[in-house]
């Protein structure tokens, strides 16, 4: 089946789907599934905007609210993970995943689903060592610290994913797995993003937690975004025994949805032709959720991963065949995810703006139903209970006084440093087109009006469609990468032909003749190697 993979969407759903429509018009190719690798920005109203960790002047409603209200429907099944620029209050309603709009599914803090027999997993957020061992304690209304820590990856999600034993076809993370850049065209990467050099050379760029998952899960494909550059790599995994078959992962990171950027890729994935067209639960993942339910932590207290070190009575929470069979029996062998989307808040109305709308902590009926179905704890309900007891608020106020400018109190971590990439702690960081050169800073972006869609022929360039074997090297890929591709049976001639085609890019254009976004960061050089939360 054909799968479209997108980088950072930043709320530009109309433009994303318009691009897919163009793909069908020009090449008669219609993707069966769209995967989005974070910074999706499922913003429903003004309150959601206030829960997004971007400077206030860059909070734009974009177009998701039209899909939430039912005014529009996603033309293709869309599955996404969260990034570091999200309406955190909205996604927090669905810790185990769920529908954010008809035909648009969020994987949750971490999740695994199946579509046409293809197993798809993902983990939301970005890695920050100082929050990694904490529980999910945050809830709206957020402050300057929790609006950021809310999207930081927690070790409990990584632990759950590491209990999986069955093969993974596709996995998504927002930030890159640490060290993945050593398996692709590093020279070309540093040519495009020279300010990555220090962290690449010190091997500190990316997420160590994602790297840990990559080594454990060994998926066929791994897709990421976040660093706003297209990059491909091919990683051959080590085998632990002679009997174990060698595995390899094709990694692809994509850019953000902007003119002249490589933000979308089409690939062919082998699937089960007898499987239905519905999104399905993964029985092993549900069994792992049930097994680890007692480990839930909704406080700021550090949680240590159970290990076989004599300190834990139990350390293996993987799903037995009996547990998986039990899940199947509970569902009567019908794994189809119910289409039970419901509105949980008012939707943005351009004619009646509510600029002072405050976010509230909401219990989503989808999560309630999911937890009741499988005997799980609703994390948000637990947070509400603790809040009512007064313990969370008291602990939080004490902790708040100790917090430093990094956004969280420092605590020991499994990892020594914050290895999440290049960015800025500057509160005025510009997250739009950060590589516009010396452009006129007065230039601003004008999104095409939804009521007046642009002419596709004038607004988009040629579209690149990947061959059956996904090309994993860039235009001047390293010889070593090409050698690995040959060893893995990839048709090099087909790949080279595809690589010479123009990649899929959205070209700016509007009725008034303005070009696409060309906004440059103030003091860009100063921001090149700071904290990551605001940069991507």
From Swiss-Prot:
Kindly give the CDD domains that the UniProt entry links to this protein: MPP_Dbr1_N
Keyword Manganese set for record = yes
Q: Where does this protein have coiled-coil stretches?
A: none
Which keywords describe this protein according to UniProt? Hydrolase, Iron, Manganese, Metal-binding, mRNA processing, Nucleus, Zinc
Family matches, as Gene3D superfamilies:
3.60.21.10
A GO BP term here is: RNA splicing, via transesterification reactions
- Cite the residue spans of the region called Lariat recognition loop: 124-154
InterPro entries, A to Z: Calcineurin-like_PHP_ApaH, DBR1_C, Dbr1_N, Metallo-depent_PP-like
According to its UniProt entry, the function of this protein is described as: Cleaves the 2'-5' phosphodiester linkage at the branch point of excised lariat intron RNA and converts them into linear molecules that can be subsequently degraded, thereby facilitating ribonucleotide turnover. Linked to its role in pre-mRNA processing mechanism, may also participate in retrovirus replication and have an antiviral cell-intrinsic defense function.
State the similarity comment: Belongs to the lariat debranching enzyme family.
Residue sites binding a divalent metal cation 1 per the record: 8, 10, 228
Which compartment or compartments is the protein found in?
Answer: Nucleus
Compositionally biased spans, kind Polar residues: 414-426
Organism superkingdom: Eukaryota
- Which residues lie within the region annotated Disordered? 388-536
Species this protein is from: Gallus gallus
Which annotated residues bind a divalent metal cation 2?
39, 84, 174, 226
The gene is DBR1
Q: Give the cofactors, semicolon-separated.
A: Fe(2+); Zn(2+); Mn(2+)
Documented EC number(s): 3.1.4.-
Primary residence: nucleus
Q: Which PANTHER family match?
A: LARIAT DEBRANCHING ENZYME (PTHR12849:SF0), RNA LARIAT DEBRANCHING ENZYME (PTHR12849)
Entry's cofactor comment: Binds 2 divalent metal cations per subunit.
Specify the protein name.
Lariat debranching enzyme
**A GO term from the CC aspect:** nucleus
Biased segments, Basic and acidic residues type: 484-504
Anything known on activity regulation? Answer: Active in presence of diverse metals including Fe(2+), Zn(2+), Mn(2+). Also activated by Ca(2+). Binds two metal cations in two adjacent alpha and beta metal-binding pockets.
One MF annotation (Gene Ontology) recorded for this entry: metal ion binding
